[in-house]
């Protein structure tokens, strides 16, 4: 899931990769032969060190190599530093990032950065926050499975907001891809993450926030205060966060915003429940989505009636003309129904072999859970919060100018 929706194009001779070799690069001597190979390239547009483990001294040597070799520094478009700290202590990770992140800011054409599968956590958040806020050239940021938690997630959201302001000042295009899955972002990160995403509304096409333990109020907050402003959204992946009816209603209101751009919608394992599923699928009967190719809706307690009353009529109306991949397994569907037979005839790879039984106790408890006041969307003074963030931006700029004058 922590992958781009496209394959970046590079000339083979301009790629330096030691990906997946499980090298233990601790000292400068450990990494020296690889840096010599890197420096020998006439041009390097992609650097891939993923699947190795790097220490502080080796990180310093790597940063120096990038900085001192213009054919690397001036040419880099993509950097993959995923899974780079296996078996490293937290102090080593922090010290490594102190060398690597600043040198990435010196690469004027670096657009794609993958930092996934590294145990960053709270100790590294200041370094990451500063890097993200000032990486004005970046277009595609992948930060998945980094052990963030809600507090770090909130600060990532603030960093995205500051990045947008810095991009505006530098006349650089906004972020196009933000992937931040498996990070335990939970509800606590939702407000500022929403504001951060909103600030890139003119650019963002891909947002993936799967497996973050976000509850209905947090999901609703993300959509209402952030995602609904992304007019060009093509791929939205919220898999394995919890919706229920409340967040489903907010999503249903936002969906028409993306009717012309949406290519893929992943709501697998989101527990929209029967009522929430109804609300979402009703949108497809009312609004045409001419570019929607992929719809993932597994394990959501969707009822057979939703398929028959909303989804099939939407298909018959021609409201989903390009839909080619459908996932609806694990819902409350009728295995022997004509409706499923019809869908299987339309979608060759459709899997419908896991059906959830309807439990009378589930039906009785569903309405009660969906009326939980704690899960409803909270009214937030976003204008005030955005103003406060802008004031922080001005203070930060003043501090940096002062530091420059002192030097």
Curated annotation (Swiss-Prot):
One of its GO terms (cellular component) is perinuclear region of cytoplasm. LRR repeats lie at residues 11-39, 40-67, 68-101, 102-133, 134-166, 167-197, 198-226, 227-256, 257-285, 286-315, 316-346. The modification Phosphoserine is found at residue 360. One of its GO terms (molecular function) is small GTPase binding. The keyword Phosphoprotein applies. Keywords: Cytoplasm, GTPase activation, Leucine-rich repeat, Phosphoprotein, Repeat. Disulfide bonds: none annotated. The keyword Phosphoprotein applies. It is found in: Cytoplasm. Pfam families: LRR_6. Disruption phenotype: Causes conditional lethality. Strains bearing this mutation do not grow at temperatures exceeding 30 degrees Celsius. Residues 353-378 are annotated as: Disordered. GO terms for biological process: nuclear export; protein import into nucleus; ribosomal subunit export from nucleus; RNA import into nucleus; subtelomeric heterochromatin formation; tRNA export from nucleus. SUPFAM superfamilies: RNI-like. Present with 52200 molecules/cell in log phase SD medium. GTPase activator for the nuclear Ras-related regulatory protein GSP1 (Ran), converting it to the putatively inactive GDP-bound state. Belongs to the RNA1 family. This is Ran GTPase-activating protein 1. It comes from Saccharomyces cerevisiae (strain ATCC 204508 / S288c).
């Amino acid at each position: 899931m922590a992958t781009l929706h496209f394959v970046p194009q590079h000339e083979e001779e301009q790629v330096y990769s030691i990906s997946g070799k499980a090298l233990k690069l601790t000292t400068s001597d450990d990494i020296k032969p690889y840096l010599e190979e890197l420096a020998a390239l006439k041009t390097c547009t992609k650097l891939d060190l993923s699947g190795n483990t790097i220490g502080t001294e080796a990180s310093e040597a790597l940063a120096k190599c990038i900085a001192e070799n213009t054919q690397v520094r001036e040419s880099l478009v993509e950097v993959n530093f995923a899974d780079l700290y296996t078996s490293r202590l937290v102090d080593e990770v922090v010290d490594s990032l102190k060398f690597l992140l600043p040198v990435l800011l010196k690469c004027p054409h670096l657009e794609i950065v993958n930092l996934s599968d590294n145990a960053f956590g709270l100790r590294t958040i200041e370094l990451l926050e500063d890097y993200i806020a000032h990486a004005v050239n970046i277009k595609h940021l992948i930060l998945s499975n980094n052990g963030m938690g809600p507090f770090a997630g909130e600060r990532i959201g603030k960093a995205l907001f500051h990045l947008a302001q810095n991009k505006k000042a530098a006349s650089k295009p906004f972020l196009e891809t933000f992937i931040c899955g498996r990070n335990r972002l939970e509800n606590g990160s939702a407000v500022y993450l929403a504001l951060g995403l909103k600030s890139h509304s003119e650019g963002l096409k891909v947002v993936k926030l799967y497996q973050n333990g976000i509850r209905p109020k947090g999901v609703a907050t993300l959509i209402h205060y952030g995602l609904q402003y992304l007019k060009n959204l093509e791929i939205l992946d919220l898999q394995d966060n919890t919706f229920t009816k409340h967040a489903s209603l907010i999503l249903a209101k936002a969906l028409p915003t993306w009717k012309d751009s949406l290519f893929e919608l992943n709501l697998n394992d989101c527990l929209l429940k029967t009522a929430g599923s109804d609300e979402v699928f009703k949108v497809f009967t009312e609004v045409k989505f001419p570019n929607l190719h992929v719809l993932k809706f597994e394990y959501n307690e969707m009822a057979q009636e939703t398929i028959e009353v909303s989804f099939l009529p939407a298909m018959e109306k021609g409201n989903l003309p390009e839909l080619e991949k459908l996932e609806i397994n694990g819902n409350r569907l009728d295995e022997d129904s004509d409706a499923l037979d019809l869908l299987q005839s339309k979608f060759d790879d459709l899997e419908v072999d896991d059906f959830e039984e309807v439990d009378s106790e589930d039906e009785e408890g569903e309405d009660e859970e969906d009326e939980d006041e704690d899960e409803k969307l909270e009214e937030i003074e976003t204008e005030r919060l955005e103003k406060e963030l802008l004031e922080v931006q001005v203070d930060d700029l003043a501090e940096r100018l002062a530091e420059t004058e002192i030097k």
